[in-house]
Amino acid sequence: MHLIHRGIVNKRYKENLLESFNQSFKKGYGIETDIHATKDGKFICFHDFTLKKTFKKNLSIKNLNYSKINEISSKFNKTVPLLKDLLKCSKNRYPLFIEIKPTFSKSLLAKLLKETSKFTKSVFISFKHKNIYNLLKIKKNTKVGLSFSAPTSIKNIIKKSNCKNINCLILDKYFINNKRIKKIKKNKYFYTVKNKKEFMKYSKKNNLIFENL
């Protein structure tokens, strides 16, 4: 299974927007996207911790209510979507790998589980592994994955993969040919494939997270 990183992105569509997500679904692909929580506890699909890169405002998402973020983003015609809107668009038909970017409190994680409870295609992933372990403490059968960047030690990846409640691993493509990684009996997704040549080379035998193809 392959996932599109933050939705279809081209001259017409921008990353992490509902229009981009919808185009991905129309092509039959699931989504890998990032989420943050706003000051008023709304979950939004957005990559960065601040608005500086996208909206030229050096403001932290965690310190802003969603209404303020919506006001700023609307001026750029890039309305930041709520996670619940993405869930609705998916119609519970397409896989959604939801990457929790910051470390969430247990109360926020519980709220996240409640908001996504009817969407069985959702999988929670994070580089902040504390998020994943706390999700499992709240609900042990939650679909979750651990994310690893390069160069993480192979030994550490194997050790953490032994947890029976971890459903999958999200790995930098740096690890794609590693023999020890291949032996791990978990679903593995490799990120981020950015060209067609690479996609064609690895797509038949691996699960890929790709973009701009």
Tell me the role of every PLM-derived stretch.
Residues 1-213:
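Phosphate-group recognition and catalysis centered on beta-loop-alpha active-site segments
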